[in-house]
């Protein structure tokens, strides 16, 4: 007959307990070495610590662009919409006097760190992560994750207008970053790197000549199309990124951010159109002739 005996409530040493690896745990959990392994090699960092480190790298990397963007946006997006004649060049000269000579290098370093940390962060977040359920593309907001990772800034036009928030497999901010990188490299190539290599500077007179060029390849593929893509993706990526950086979570506030982003984008397109319609026949030789000639030489294109 089994009898129960009262024992004093003393702590039990776990080392004195029997270890049965296969009784209640998956194979390998009984190993005293609890370090995680990748390809069989133990590593000391957890996924959360990697995320935290990469997120901090992204936060630090935006500082040069966050300081530069207001000046550049006022010069390139707003001023030409108000007065496309000489005002943009006047503001450009003033901005160049304010900024240090290493501005471009700081921006390139910050962008490189930002992109690298972002790609690695995506890899860490998606490591062994189950795929999202793709059913029920539009959901009622009360049942849905309304974070920017899930629905973007406002969940698309339907979310902005009607509260039917669209979920995205890849966040719109990430997509805009993927689009932004190649056009930004092209922008730096024709506006900074190649002009510096031939000892010239690009101003708004050059931009007007490019956008009103009789050469359709220069005008559209070399000028208007990449500038429009840069404008749309850049303003959205920076605006939604700042919204996330400042911890804006309320949907009403995010809709206000979205409205501001759309208005700034619209003003930017007005600036492009006004610059394109400017008379560039009295502006002298087109500097982009030498710039594109240099690019053709670099690409070995006749």
From Swiss-Prot:
GO BP field: lipid homeostasis; mitochondrion organization; protein localization to mitochondrion
Chain segments annotated as transmembrane: 62-82, 101-121, 174-194, 220-240, 259-276
UniProt effect for mutating residue 237 to A: Disrupts activity
Record's subcellular location: Mitochondrion outer membrane
Region Disordered, residue ranges: 1-35
Record note on what altering residue 187 to A does: Disrupts activity
SUPFAM superfamilies per record: Fumarate reductase respiratory complex transmembrane subunits
Pfam families: MCP1_TM
A GO term from the CC aspect: mitochondrion
GO molecular function: protein-macromolecule adaptor activity
Residues on Cytoplasmic side: 1-61, 122-173, 241-258
The protein's role, per its UniProt record: Recruits the lipid transfer protein Vps13 to mitochondria thereby promoting vacuole-mitochondria contacts. Involved in mitochondrial lipid homeostasis.
Protein name from the UniProt record: Mitochondrial adapter protein MCP1
């Amino acid at each position: 007959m089994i009898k129960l005996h009262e024992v004093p409530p003393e702590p039990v040493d776990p080392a004195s307990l029997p270890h049965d690896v296969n009784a209640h745990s998956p194979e390998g959990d009984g190993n005293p070495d609890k370090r995680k392994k990748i390809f069989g090699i133990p590593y000391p960092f957890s996924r959360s610590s990697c995320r935290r480190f990469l997120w901090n790298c992204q936060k630090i990397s935006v500082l040069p662009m966050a300081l530069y963007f207001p000046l550049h946006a006022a010069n390139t997006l707003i001023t030409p919409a108000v007065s496309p004649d000489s005002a943009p060049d006047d503001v450009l000269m003033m901005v160049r006097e304010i900024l240090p000579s290493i501005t471009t290098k700081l921006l390139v370093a910050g962008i490189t760190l930002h992109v690298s940390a972002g790609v690695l962060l995506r890899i860490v977040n998606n490591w062994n992560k189950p795929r999202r359920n793709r059913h029920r593309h539009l959901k009622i907001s009360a049942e849905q994750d309304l974070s920017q990772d899930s629905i973007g800034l406002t969940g698309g036009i339907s979310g902005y207008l009607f509260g039917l928030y669209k979920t995205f497999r890849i966040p719109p901010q990430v997509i805009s970053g993927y689009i932004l990188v190649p056009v930004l490299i092209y922008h730096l190539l024709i506006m900074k790197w190649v002009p510096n290599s031939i000892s010239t500077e690009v101003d708004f007179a050059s931009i007007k000549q490019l956008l009103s060029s009789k050469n359709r390849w220069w005008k559209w593929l070399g000028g208007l199309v990449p500038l429009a893509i840069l404008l749309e993706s850049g303003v959205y990526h920076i605006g939604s990124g700042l919204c996330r950086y400042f911890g804006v979570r309320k949907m009403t506030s995010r809709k206000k951010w979205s409205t501001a982003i759309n208005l700034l984008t619209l003003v930017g397109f007005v600036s492009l159109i006004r610059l394109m319609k400017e008379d560039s026949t009295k502006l002298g030789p087109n500097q982009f002739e030498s710039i594109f000639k240099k690019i053709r030489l670099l690409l070995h294109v006749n």
